[in-house]
Amino acid sequence: MNKSITVDSENRVDFRNNVDYCVGTGRWGLALTEEYLKELEFVQNEIGFKFIRGHGIFHDDLSIYHEYEEDGETKLEYNYTYLFRIIDRFMEIGIRPYLELSFMPSQLAKGTQTLFHWKANTTPPKEYRLWNKMVVDLLKNLRARYGEEVLEWPIEVWNEPNLPGFWFKGDMDEYFKLFKETYEAIKAYDSRFKVGGPAICGVMEEDWIREFLTFCKRFNLKPDNITRHHYTVEFPETIGHYDYSKLEDSDMRIANLQATRDLVDTFDEYKGTPIHITEFSTSYTPRGVIHDTNLNAAFLAHQLSHLGDMNELYSYWTFGDVFEEKGVPNSLFHGGFGMVAAGNIPKPTFWIFSFYKHLKEFSEACVLRDENAIIVKSEEGYAGILWDKDNEDLDIEITLPIENDEYTIIRKTVDEECCNPLKLWHDIGEPAYPTKEQTELIKSCAFPLITSDVLKVEDGKTIVKSTVRKHGIEYFEIKKRIFTPDRGYNYEKVISTH
């Protein structure tokens, strides 16, 4: 497939690149493990997310909520030992919590329904008074330890209450009560905290958003952001441990997000309220095999070029494969949500986030966006990302206006031939538990192919030609060449003499 693009350097595309705003994680308690922290450090060193959002801040494994009997009375105390240990480490790594308030401590729960391998209680509180007290005490203690910056940590009430497994019977009215109680308790403590919801996913999402805003309007609640999730596959076929899904149309899924923006804006009271996509990916299961592929990265390249159009925040689910919703993973590559596999092996998806972060650092002045490319311009030159989510290679020719001079073009390429750790793992026998040597071998082929060239511009423009292989992504930068050769050194003679 062939394609030609001509860039107008004076053109400006309304492109909002918030790729590094937030990233997802498995439950909070996993942050007490060594492998988890190694993966998070690896991600932060290359990409550097601002916030991290995960489940289970009130789950029993963090041991925050305690009821005990004394002198014939039921008394209450809180324990923040593990939570502070986790957040201290987060802050050392350079990331802050996005506070999803979930799930229910077993002593506070009204029922016994649980979810996941780790038994998250997904029932309402037995007393909302005790829930509110716990939430406010949490915020007070966070503020006492970490200062006024805590006021800027976003808060989300629960997770996916429209799904019966995540909230008892998927009871809309009961969730609205939870939101109202929580919102009013937090705002009564300090109105500057930013509180959002309803954190829905997939099922009856339009009805939930409409009814949620109608409820908020009725009770004069003004959520600081509207939260929802965004996944882009059809219902999976499950074989053994694994889920196989077909991707939905990327433009259709972007249109679905725009429909949420449009719906929110039909309410005068909430017009312009920021929308946070607090989870997004392709597959919504932690055994979705597409997550480990090059296609996953190429599909997300297109999504990332549009997610900022209608959403202030979009948080990829998740940064790493330390994750236990369906139990402990059975193998190195298992369709895990993470952009990094065990042993700090970056998957292709890791690199599309890295590329968008580099693009953001290069410039926010977007001069072109289409189905296969996004290009920005700065005083230094140009940078761009190319992708091909189709099943045949794409030969692309880009004409760029640029002043006469010499330039260096650097390309970083990730595709099924040059950066495909999944294939190497498969080729050596799909070891479930790779040895140290095998892990290093797999990791060695998990990095982009870097190439370079010199562009000599003499007529005010240059033409960049690239072949983006199927399911491939490419990042490029074009900057002026600063040539400072030493006396007597001739590169052309070096490479031709021998």
PLM regions and their residue ranges:
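Substrate-binding clefts and catalytic carboxylate motifs of secreted carbohydrate-active enzymes
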Residues: R287-E325, S378, N404-I450
